[in-house]
Amino acid sequence: MGALAELAGDEKNGEGSRTFVFTNEGHTLGNALKTIIARYPEVDFCGYTIPHPTEQKLHFRIQSRRDRAIDILKRGLEDLEGLCDHTIVTFEKEMAEFNAMKVEN
């Protein structure tokens, strides 16, 4: 699991605009999290970059005039976790039904 840090230099933009640095993460987390957070109505901008292909770092930017960026990030991670949990439950249910049908035939 990676670590999370806040990129220095954002203080002048207020608490609604921050860039977070995830270590040992890449496009898988970045794109999924961006897709979720970008849909929040209070978010003005959300995006990510991988600064260099040889570095295992993900820079994740959130801008909002209403809410703190750290709170939006936390909510996004919680929503992503809920989506993953739902996907696992749905998959396991469908697999059980498929296997039951296979046994019957």
UniProtKB/Swiss-Prot annotation:
DNA-dependent RNA polymerase catalyzes the transcription of DNA into RNA using the four ribonucleoside triphosphates as substrates. Common core component of RNA polymerases I and III which synthesize ribosomal RNA precursors and small RNAs, such as 5S rRNA and tRNAs, respectively. GO terms for biological process: transcription by RNA polymerase I; transcription by RNA polymerase III; transcription elongation by RNA polymerase I; tRNA transcription by RNA polymerase III. InterPro entries: RBP11-like, RBP11-like_dimer, RNA_pol_Rpb11_13-16kDa_CS, RNAP_AC19, Rpo11-like. Component of the RNA polymerase I (Pol I) and RNA polymerase III (Pol III) complexes consisting of at least 13 and 17 subunits, respectively. Its main location: nucleus. This is DNA-directed RNA polymerases I and III subunit RPAC2. One of its GO terms (molecular function) is DNA-directed RNA polymerase activity. GO terms for cellular component: RNA polymerase I complex; RNA polymerase III complex. Belongs to the archaeal Rpo11/eukaryotic RPB11/RPC19 RNA polymerase subunit family. CDD domains: RNAP_I_III_AC19 (cd07029). It is found in: Nucleus. Keywords: DNA-directed RNA polymerase, Nucleus, Transcription. Pfam families: RNA_pol_L_2.
